[in-house]
UniProtKB/Swiss-Prot annotation:
Keywords: ANK repeat, Repeat. SMART domains: ANK (SM00248). ANK repeats lie at residues 6-35, 40-69, 91-118, 119-147, 149-177, 180-209, 214-243, 248-277, 280-312, 316-345. It comes from Fowlpox virus (strain NVSL) (FPV). Disulfide bonds: none annotated. This is Putative ankyrin repeat protein FPV242. It comes from the Viruses.
Length: 358
């Protein structure tokens, strides 16, 4: 960090005014000025980028032998990021005076930075803004498409559409490799874009591909999103319906039941999901249904229809609903008792008796 001395102020002013001779003169007098960082973690190069001063950027890059090292050091925002953010903001606005000139200046600055050898970054911003020129430029220059970005915010997956995927595939990006941390199929699932999913599968996408160390299976992601069309299409194309979560080793049907998504559970069961998985306390999925956000009674009846019973610790089936004195709870308790529920805990027995009496 620096305290603003007279030379720094003069150089900053010269950059904003794009007074090239003055910039060169001050740098020659004090070469170290060029790599100093202000209280906002900005170098003078950042200032030149923010004011879109193309010639000033080029002079600073030419004069600063150590500048690339400094600007790629955390916590300083990489100047390429700074330029890309400004560029994308401009292209998303409709009414700006001299917009075309400003956009072109940003392009020239981005090109100058890349030519100087700064670390390639910002693809996730380009994708989130659907900026075709920038996506193509970064890929052509050799950016690692798997890199998730400077900030842990990821891509706005709703912007990944067929047009964006066509650009990526035309630029020789492997359809099954992660792009900014996610496969293209994963983006289609997360955005519930059935047309995109169909397009990707037609181009040879593997519907099972994902980051196995950090992400749940695609079928679980799709079920949690709740789009029946997406889930059914994945099943039609051979996705494994019973692949379990990396976090709790439960399959998609478990999550569908917990969310109370009756139609999703019905679809999964009709398409061959295993209803006989073991849950906490060696219980069945019926214990999960008693904890569902909605449709508890319907889900229990559906599971019973498929032959699911009440094994394991029977207190697990009843405990989640003991504080819910609703008519649905009354019916749930009755149907569980009819199908062999045995309550062994005195506390649970008393609470159940009170609900039935009410």
């Amino acid at each position: 960090m620096i305290s603003f001395n007279n030379n720094y102020r003069k150089l900053r002013k010269a950059i904003i005014n794009e007074d090239i001779e003055e910039i060169k003169y001050i740098i020659e007098k004090d070469p170290n000025m060029i790599v100093k960082v202000d209280n906002n973690n900005h170098t003078l190069l950042h200032i030149a980028i923010m004011y879109r001063k193309v010639n000033a950027v080029k002079v600073l890059l030419d004069k600063g032998d150590n500048l690339v090292y400094v600007i790629n050091s955390f916590p300083i925002l990489p100047p390429l990021y700074c330029a890309i953010i400004g560029f994308c903001k401009l292209t998303r606005r409709n009414k700006i005076s001299n917009a075309l000139e400003k956009i072109n200046n940003h392009k020239k600055i981005i090109e100058a930075l890349v030519d100087k050898g700064v670390e390639l970054t910002g693809l996730e911003i380009a994708l989130s803004c659907k900026n075709i020129w920038l996506i193509k430029f970064l890929i052509e220059k050799g950016i690692s498409v798997e890199y998730t970005g400077f900030f842990p915010v990821g891509v706005n997956y709703n912007t990944i559409d067929i047009d964006i995927c066509k650009v990526l595939l035309e630029n020789k990006i492997d359809i099954n490799k992660p792009v900014c941390g996610e496969t293209l199929v994963r983006y289609a699932i997360r955005s519930s874009d059935l047309n995109l999913l169909k397009y990707l599968i037609s181009k040879g996408a593997d519907i099972e591909k994902r980051n196995k160390y950090e992400q749940d299976p695609n079928i679980i992601e799709a079920v949690e999103k709740g789009n029946l069309g997406i889930v059914e299409y994945l099943i039609d194309n051979g996705i494994s319906i019973d692949t379990v979560s990396i976090y709790n080793h439960k399959p998609a049907i478990y999550y569908a039941i917990l969310a109370g998504h009756y139609n999703m559970v019905d679809l999964l069961l009709r398409r061959g999901a295993n209803p006989f998985i073991t849950c906490e306390g060696n219980t069945s999925l019926i214990s999960v249904a008693t904890q569902a956000k909605r449709n508890r009674l319907k889900l229990i009846n559906l599971l019973l229809k498929y032959g699911v019973r009440l094994p394991g610790d029977h207190d697990y089936y009843i405990q989640p609903i003991l504080l819910d004195y609703s008519y649905e709870t009354y019916n749930i308790i009755h149907i569980l008792l009819e199908h062999g529920l045995r309550i062994t805990s005195n506390t649970t027995l008393v609470s159940t008796f009170l609900i039935i009496r009410v």
